[in-house]
Swiss-Prot record:
Belongs to the DapB family. Disulfide bonds: none annotated. CDD domains: DHDPR_N. This is 4-hydroxy-tetrahydrodipicolinate reductase. Pathway: Amino-acid biosynthesis; L-lysine biosynthesis via DAP pathway; (S)-tetrahydrodipicolinate from L-aspartate: step 4/4. Pfam families: DapB_C (PF05173), DapB_N (PF01113). The gene is dapB. Keywords: Amino-acid biosynthesis, Cytoplasm, Diaminopimelate biosynthesis, Lysine biosynthesis, NAD, NADP, Oxidoreductase. Its EC number is 1.17.1.8. One of its GO terms (molecular function) is oxidoreductase activity, acting on CH or CH2 groups, NAD or NADP as acceptor. It catalyses: (S)-2,3,4,5-tetrahydrodipicolinate + NAD(+) + H2O = (2S,4S)-4-hydroxy-2,3,4,5-tetrahydrodipicolinate + NADH + H(+); (S)-2,3,4,5-tetrahydrodipicolinate + NADP(+) + H2O = (2S,4S)-4-hydroxy-2,3,4,5-tetrahydrodipicolinate + NADPH + H(+). NAD(+) binds at G11, A12, T13, G14, K15, M16, G106, T107, T108. PROSITE patterns: DAPB. One of its GO terms (cellular component) is cytosol. It comes from Synechococcus elongatus (strain ATCC 33912 / PCC 7942 / FACHB-805).
Length: 273
């Protein structure tokens, strides 16, 4: 019988971290071996008790390198799932790769230069790494539908809406959507007039191939995206709404299982489906 995949969760007490702990505990082929969080008031506490599952015998620690070192000694190839913060994610991934622990990154905010550097580092180390801005299967389907629609429309804008604790804007999912549309090799939104913003930023950020991205941050939201196409006489709106973070867990578990089979960095859930 195969041994379960050892998994460390970094950002274990955050919203996504808690859902990931629950998903790992419920799965038969993965096992939680580490839980990392920065908050001083949870150090040493059982992560199972914190998330409401009862004892899992996994104490919370803030020692990332120490936990990566321990995980690297597991019989099976270990994985670290990271839901932390844009300010530390680059260093977190480099440390994981250095210890041979396969990173599954749900934290957004990495820029293109950082992604390229991490890709080169992972390739040299022959370590698989997955950077996934959105783990929802429905979101992947929205992106694919947007690609099909963009063949017939020259005008498109992206609206992304998230909870008010999200640190980066625009979201990694919106950027990924714009990048996928831009890969078609066409320039969108040919100008009709000379625009003048009376308030800077009113028309949103200009992404690749002139695709504008608009960000909303409000309490009450979780994660939502609209891709809006326009043509004379009609509007086509594609929308995905996250109602509960549990919708991400099938994608998270899929990534945990897949990343150990890879060498190098892959960006986007669509690349492993």
């Amino acid at each position: 019988m195969a041994h379960p995949i050892p998994v460390v969760v970094n950002g274990a007490t955050g919203k996504m971290g808690r859902e990931t702990i629950k998903a790992i505990a419920a799965a038969d082929d993965v096992t939680l071996v580490g839980a990392i969080a920065r908050s001083a008031d949870v150090q040493g506490q059982d992560i199972g008790e914190i998330v409401g599952l009862g004892p899992l015998e996994v104490p919370v620690t803030n020692d990332l390198e120490g936990m990566l070192c321990l995980a690297s000694q597991e019989r099976e190839v270990p994985v670290v799932v990271d839901f932390t913060h844009p300010d530390c994610i680059y260093d977190n991934v480099r440390k994981a790769i250095a210890y041979g622990v396969r990173p599954v990154v749900g934290t957004t905010g990495l820029n293109n230069e950082q992604l390229q550097e991490l890709a080169e580092f992972a390739e040299k180390a022959s370590v698989g790494c997955l950077v996934i801005p959105n783990f929802s299967i429905g979101m992947v389907l929205l992106m694919q539908a947007a690609i099909q629609a963009s063949r017939f429309y020259d005008h498109v804008e992206i609206l992304e809406l998230h909870h008010d604790q999200k640190a980066d804007a625009p979201s990694g999912t919106a950027i990924k959507t714009a990048q996928m549309l831009a890969e078609l090799g066409k320039t969108f939104n040919p100008p009709k007039v000379t625009e003048k913003e009376t308030m800077p930023g009113a028309r949103g950020a200009v992404g690749p191939e002139n695709i504008r991205i608009h960000s909303v941050r409000l309490p009450g939201l979780i994660a939502h995206e609209e891709v809006i196409f326009g043509a004379p006489g009609e509007i086509l709106t594609l929308r995905h709404d996250t109602m509960d973070r549990s919708c991400y867990m099938p994608g998270v578990l899929l990534a945990v299982r897949k990343v150990r089979q890879l060498t190098g960095l892959i960006y986007g859930l669509d690349r492993i489906l």
